[in-house]
A protein has these predicted regions:
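A charged helix-plus-loop insertion that forms the helical arch/lid used to bind
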Residues: 1-16, 63
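A short, structure-level motif marking secondary-structure boundaries and short turns
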Residues: 14-17, 60-62, 138-139, 170-171
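Glycine-rich anion/phosphate-binding loops
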Residues: 13-32, 65-71, 115-116
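Active-site-proximal loop/short-helix segments
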Residues: 1-3, 40-60, 64, 86-107
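Second-shell residues forming the walls of enzyme active-site clefts
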Residues: 68-196
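Hydrophobic/aromatic pocket-lining and membrane-interface residues
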Residues: 1, 34, 76
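Acidic-leg catalytic submotif of subtilisin-like serine proteases
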Residues: 30-42
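Solvent-exposed, charged interface segments at domain starts and junctions
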Residues: 11-25, 86-99
Length: 196
């Protein structure tokens, strides 16, 4: 059984080299097992910072510190690539700070843009194949969730210079209901700049 990503963060706190090695191995095993069953892509790694109170992110987050998240996600990505699978960072620009679960309600992050820089840094630093946007409203930039925000997707493309695939999070989640039914969700995400 693969460990929760938070376990890799705990290993990091004691031994950084061991944590990098473990993350690389986890990425390889995850990708190799999925590919052996015909699955060629996994929405991993979670790049959200572990602020503590978010139960939905919980132990899926590597660590509280952005630099540690970057190091462990990079090692995990190396393992994924060694087994022939791409990486998809999520949940852009960061879901770890808010407590509500976007599967069942609509989270709002009221921080200033400057306060979000640690959350955004992994997307600047990592060589990701894909990015999944979050069903969270970040009032500092837009009143739409990141999935439905041409401002956030534009920032990802133009400022961060990400040129891979931009995915929505699951459009059946409650956090996606802000724009109406499924057809509106698909059209709004596509018009905001999401690829899939």
């Amino acid at each position: 059984r693969l460990p929760a990503m938070a376990m890799l963060g705990k290993i990091w706190d004691d031994d950084q080299d061991a944590a990098r090695g473990a993350a690389r191995q986890v990425g390889y095993v995850l990708a190799a097992e999925l590919r052996s069953r015909g699955v060629d892509y996994s929405f991993t790694p979670v790049l959200d910072l572990d602020y503590g109170p978010s139960r939905v992110i919980g132990d899926r987050a590597f660590h509280r510190q952005s630099a540690v998240v970057i190091a462990l996600a990079a090692a995990l990505g190396e393992g994924l690539h060694l087994a022939g699978m791409g990486s998809c960072g999520k949940h852009f620009p960061g879901h770890g700070y808010v407590i509500p679960d976007s599967h069942v309600e609509l989270p709002v992050d009221d921080r200033a843009f400057e306060a979000m820089q640690d959350d955004i840094e992994p997307y600047r630093q990592l060589p990701l194949d894909g990015v999944m946007a979050a069903h969270v409203i970040y009032n500092c930039i837009d009143c739409n969730t990141a999935v439905f925000s041409n401002k956030w997707i534009g920032y990802l493309r133009n400022d961060i210079k990400f040129n891979g695939v931009v995915f929505t999070d699951d459009l059946s989640m409650a956090g996606a209901g802000v724009v109406g039914g499924m057809l509106n969700r698909v059209e709004t995400a596509y018009n905001a700049g999401c690829d899939m």
